[in-house]
């Protein structure tokens, strides 16, 4: 079965359709609709529909996006795409697309991919960092993604740090 992956970022959505061997059949990039949630849903739905019309065969849909998916509610939280926060994106897309949608944090997707078949495949512990419109991280140990009870394990981009003290930390 073909697989459609969407990498949702603060400024762009990149879509790639892969065949059974992992070869890219089509790649497309569009601006991220980030002003209204309804526009975001329409943009993603239109993109997936374009692929359906062109390839005329079923494919799975997987989405990596900034922010966490609450294990309790399934709603997006902590996203730098503010219109997504509090929304049940998976349910909304599944209803519009009439098919299952896999949804995960983008940094978690990156870290797991590198740990399984990328630069970290020989390592026991892999930390993946994303630097873009926002920043985030994912941690994989023994090929297993760590997400934690709040689905934010590995996230480092929005942590409060203590202030710099020259007498304690030295001069730079």
Positions of predicted regions on the chain:
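Glycine-rich phosphate-binding loop and adjoining helix at the ATP-binding site
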Residues: 38, 42-45, 49, 57-61, ...
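Short glycine-rich anion-binding loops that position phosphate/pyrophosphate groups of nucleotides
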Residues: 11, 66-69, 132-134
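Conserved phosphate-binding loops in N-terminal lobes of ATP-dependent enzymes
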Residues: 3-65
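Residue-level recognition of short loop/turn positions
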Residues: 9, 21, 72-73, 142
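Glycine/GP-enriched mid-protein hinge/lid loop-to-helix segment characteristic of carbohydrate kinases
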Residues: 2-4, 16-18, 27, 36-37, ...
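Residue-level recognition of specific faces of alpha-helices
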Residues: 14, 68, 109, 155-158
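Glycine/Thr-rich phosphate-binding loops of Rossmann-like dinucleotide-binding domains
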Residues: 14, 71-73, 137
